[in-house]
Every structure is written in structure tokens, then in C-alpha cells.
């Protein structure tokens, strides 16, 4: 079995990433935070050889094909504070050290064959590691991470940093993160979308932050999914026609009050699904119709697809508006002539 085949078993489920039950994740996040606050002083618990024997599995050939080694390690929820022992297990490809009390992952710098890493629910303040040439999936969810510096793995495809304490995205270099297609940052303390200049990105999750507007995402030409649920967004500026691949946009639970803001989404040529539930604008009687009038190619609003009758009615309204605008344009020159003659 190839490394790629093995990795498929560990990849993040896209359906899970795109589901809309953020409430459950918020509860998990608060549980982790509470646990961390109540247990400031941990008893020192280093990783031991006995623990390694219990956690190792998946026997595979090593790089030269002449020997075998266990390449998967799962040591979850063991109250670990030190994983220094991992330095010598250089053949590991899949490592899960979640739900421990780790503050330092530097021993992983020696695992240059690492493909998959999960370190959720620890006491990490940084996700910084040396460049790992084969690392493809990394999850540091529900820690105490405050920045995004020191992440430069060239084959990294999916990065999960949800439920941390990040205020601003910095240090994510598109010249180094050339494979990153999924970035999970929901449940942080972000007050800006600046710093996410990653043209290869396809899925971006920014729900449950402190965002008031969208900015700096104009060059994400490959982005197909954008989650902005439960922020403080009032205006829909910041979207551009360069975002030509965006198909799904979730703005649920924001502060968009003016239906006219939807006109700013017209330039998104592939936008098919829009979620606006729990925004003030959804209280308007013609909310559903107005959305389709403004965005003609929209197929689904919230959880319901548009019917043919709705689409035909929206077409009629757009045509009527166009004719009225043309008539107004014809009247204006005549008014100017009348004024000049007097």
C-alpha cells in the first residue's frame, strides 16, 4: 500500500468541514478552554517506551524497502507533558497526540517522513515546526495558539487551527504553502481577514470570529467554499470577480441589514449557494425574491433551492428594472436641454 493510499484513511471529511452545526463545535471548544483554565499545573508525564508499544501500529517498509517499521502512533488522552522520546522514531508517518498537556512539539522536527499530524486539545501556544517535506494534513485545534507563524510545509494540504486564540493571520507564505487547499480558523478571535493570501486555497472556514468585514481575499481565485458564520459583518464589500471559483458562501448569523448589499455579490460568477439565515435582512418580506433579483445565477438560498416560478418572477422584475433605468436615461438628456434653453 502506498503512502497516498494510507493517507486517504486519515484525511479530513469534507462533509464534516462543511456541515452547519457549529453549535456542537462551540461546546467542544468551551470544554477544552475550561479544562485548560482549571488545570494550570500538570504533573510531569513524559512519553515512555511502554506507551510507545501500546500506541504503535501499521507495519510498513522503510524508505530503502529492505526493513520494516511501525509508522502510525496514537497516544491520545494520556496526560502527556513531554514527547521527547519521539525524536528517535524517525519512520513515523501518522501521529496523534491529541488531548494531552503538551506545550512543545519540537521533537516532531525529527520526523521527516511525517504525513499526518493531529495535536488537538493540548496547551500549545504555537504551531511552529521545522519544514516537514511530506506533511500533508495537520490539526492543532482547541489549543491556546495565538499566531500562525512557523508553518511552511510545502505539501501541506489541510491545516486546522480552529478553537484557538488567533487575532491576526500572519506568516502564511504562498511561496512555501504551495499545496494548501483547506484552512480551518473558526472559533478564534480574528478581527480581520487580511493575511490569507493563498491563491491555491479552496476551502476557508472563518466562522465564530470577530470579523466586521471581508478584506484581502480578492486574489483567492480557486476558493470554492467560504464560511463566515457567526461574525459581525454588516457590509458585503470585499468580494470581487477575481474570486471566480466561489460556489458556497455562508454568512449566517451576521449583521447584514440592507438587502441592497446583495448586489455586491453579483460579480461572483459561480456563486450557487448562499446562506443568510439569522441576519436582519431576512426579516424583509421580499428577502428571498430580492436575493434572486440581485444574483441571477443563485441556485439555493439558505436551505431551499429556487423553484422555476421564483426564477421566472425574478427575471421579470430584472427586465422591468432595466426598462425603467433606460427610460430614466432617456429623460435626463431632455431635461438638460430644457434647462439650457431657458
Curated annotation (Swiss-Prot):
Chain intervals with Acidic residues compositional bias: 1-30, 325-342
Keyword field contains Cell membrane: no
Annotated Pfam families: LRR_9
Region (Interaction with RSPH9): 207-342
Protein name, per record: Leucine-rich repeat-containing protein 23
PROSITE patterns listed in its UniProt record: LRR (PS51450)
Stretches of the chain forming a coiled coil according to its record: 3-27, 306-332
Chain positions of LRR repeats: 91-112, 113-133, 134-154, 155-176, 179-199, 200-221, 222-243, 245-266
GO cellular-component term (any): cytoplasm
Gene3D superfamilies: Ribonuclease Inhibitor
Stored InterPro entries: Leu-rich_rpt, LRR_dom_sf, SDS22/Internalin_LRR
Domain LRRCT residue range list: 279-317
Subcellular location: Cytoplasm, Cytoskeleton, Flagellum axoneme; Cytoplasm
Classification lineage: Eukaryota, Metazoa, Chordata, Craniata, Vertebrata
Function in brief: Essential for sperm motility and male fertility. Plays an important role in the proper assembly of the third radial spoke (RS3) head and the bridge structure between RS2 and RS3 in the sperm flagella.
UniProtKB keywords: Cell projection, Cilium, Coiled coil, Cytoplasm, Cytoskeleton, Flagellum, Leucine-rich repeat, Repeat
Subunit structure: Component of the axonemal radial spoke complex. Interacts with RSPH3. Interacts with RSPH9.
Region (Disordered): 1-42, 307-342
Ranges of compositional bias, category Basic and acidic residues: 314-324
SUPFAM superfamilies documented for this protein: L domain-like (SSF52058)
